[in-house]
Amino acid sequence: MMLILALLPLSMKAQGWPQDYGGVMLQGFYWDSFADAQWSRLEKQVDNLSTTFDLVWLPQSGDCGGQSMGYDDLYWFPGHYNSSFGTEAELRSLIKTFRTKGIGTIADVVINHRKNVSNWVDFPKETYKGVTYQLLSTDICADDDGGKAKTEASKLGLSVSSNKDTGEGWGGMRDLDHKSTNVQTNVKAYLHMLLEDFGYVGFRYDMVKGYSGEFTKLYNEDSKPQFSVGECWDSSNTIKNWIDATGKTSAAFDFQFRYTVRNAANNGDWSKLAAQNDGNWPLVSSGFFTGSYRQYAVTFVENHDTEYRSATAQQDPLRKDTLAANAYLLAMPGTPCVFMKHWQAYKQEIANMVAVRKAVGITNMSKPTPMATNKEYYAVQVAGSGDKKLLCVVGTKAEDYTPTSAAWKKVISGYHYVYYVSGIEPSVITLPELQEDEQPQDGEFNGVPSFCTVGDGEICAFFEAPITWGSQIYTWAWMKGGDGKDYLGTGWPGVAATLLGTADNGNKVFKWTSANTTAPDNIIFSGGGSQTADMVFENGGYYNKDGLKTNVITGIRTISPNHGDATNIYSLDGRLVRQPKPGIYIRNNKKVVIR
């Protein structure tokens, strides 16, 4: 008994991913998914998501100081969680709703690098539960950005760390020195907060090649997440070495699995599923250390870095046979991570695949056995729980394959894929019935809400945002002959507008107030990857995506220029008028006529 008790703590150490885990994860975003990945919108889909997914990986959820996918992280602690995907309250509500429906939420954790506030070396000061957290210039790696950070720090009379980066450098932002006690203190507090305050169940660590895996071990042993997966984008041996460096406190994405699927689908040669990719077996393959790293493999066939984004940013996407690729993904060991765009396009079929996977009892440690391979199709048998097995056949002629035993019974099929099962009757497998996801609809303009007001002398504008434009709207304003940076003092997309409330039609209304004494000539509003056209600025103007609708300043009365009231008078475009001529002006937030 004493021996068992002595060994117990060792067996209970933080494990990067549970053994024999049968769950499936959704990547709940894609690049520039500012509308589809809104916290409030995801929450409305929870009933459908909970039929299929056990985990949902969300984009980095902190305020990055502008419209962002979150990889230029700025703030880490509560009070700064109004992001491009929603408010802090909406995020907390989403995580809570997911939890009540049996879904765990995975946080995207970006700690390789961090954005600065105003220069090369300053970081925000944040107070959480009475403790102040702030990274210093001395927390930046000595060789950051080829020594440029050190040079810039010196110009300010500051210094950087004496420690060089423990991983690959990246010039986009400041690489953090994870040997620093202060960095470790900040990161540990941040991770504990994500788990214990927001309610995340685990982490997806971004760009883990940027710092030594020993620090992921340090952080995971301290915070003890239920799930941890790192983005180690490299060969299988490099990924294995990183997993080992973490003390197996973290799983990793199986990039070589993804590449073998891409090779097969894009080339129309399904025998490539049985081949290496540039000398690399996938982590889940029996050819890679006899499959002993399957537990730590999070498999996928597409993500935000490989997807097709546009004609000028094509990346390295699956170009065809998305369904067959997902059928293979969801039949194989490892923990599958389904890409949001694939789920959106094929909800019912992917849900059916997952239902069969779970009914058979396939886990991250199940054993696959190839049954047939040629250019037209690939067949693989995967052992589930007990005597149950799944036979997955994918390829252009998947339907032509005939199982070698009558014990196999077809359960589902589709374009270039077939699932057979044995040891379980297809009739006992319940396929989910998904609901139609509610599609947000913008309301028609029906007047200015009462909460829209203009202060005396205030230069401002209002914007009624489409529902799909996200929860943060930005304002870009400029003078003729200049640009927004000249007028606003910042780059695109400009200055964040303030959310005032919700109009009667359900659209959110934002207000922007100029910090200048002179009104701009033009204005643009943007959010969620969308923007208005260039519009003429009208002070107090109430705009929507189609342009100026009306002016918030209501009421009109006649006054004389010599009535004795010293209140300032402004032109309709917001300029102070010292000696008004006859015409219409603004005074005390009202339109007035001077005759």
Q: Which residues are covered by each model-predicted region?
A:
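Bacterial N-terminal signal peptides
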Residues: M1-P9
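Boundary/entry segment of secreted carbohydrate-active catalytic domains
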Residues: Q15-Q38, G169-S180, C460-E464, W469-S471, ...
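Active-site-proximal helices and loops of the catalytic beta/alpha 8
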Residues: Q15-W31, R41-S50, Q60-D73, I95-I103, ...
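Aromatic- and acidic-residue-enriched carbohydrate-binding clefts of CAZyme catalytic domains
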Residues: Y21, C64-K96, T127-D177
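Substrate-binding cleft of carbohydrate-active enzyme catalytic domains
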Residues: G86-Y128
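Aromatic-rich carbohydrate-binding modules that target alpha-glucans
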Residues: P466-T517, G529-M535
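Residue-level detector of functionally pivotal "anchor" positions at catalytic/ligand-binding pockets or at interdomain
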Residues: V552-D573
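C-terminal tail/sorting-segment detector
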Residues: I584-R595
